Amino acid sequence: MSSNKLLFFVDEGGFDDYTPLFARLGFSVDFENSQRKAVKLAKKNKYQVLVAEFSYNPEFRDRVSNIESLLATLESHSPEAKIIILFDKINQTQLDQLKQRYKTDCTLAFPVIEEKLMACFN
């Protein structure tokens, strides 16, 4: 089994499942669509990469997005993890706010082009 672990967090979905691509790149993939369960996984495992779907909801009172708890957990449990964010262009302003607070290595707007996603791993 691969020692390279990747956490793939999908909130709303509606895009391709990149799990086979991540496996071809040599990663053992944990796929999660529950933010709470993703945080639990991040506490239990050391990840080399997080690929997460960014969602903004104006009803969030104390945060900008759906992934802040996950990013905070990774900062303490897997600080070296590469952070790749997938997002809708209409949420660019909110993503920029998130990027001021948390490390991000690569951000890709939908529709995600597989070659650009692969380039994020280099």
Where are these regions (language model features)?
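Alpha4 helix (beta4-alpha4-beta5 surface) of REC/receiver domains from two-component response regulators
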Residues: 62-65, 85-107
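Acidic, metal-coordinating helix/loop segments flanking the phosphotransfer/catalytic sites
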Residues: 33-49, 55, 59
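C-terminal output helix
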Residues: 37, 112-121
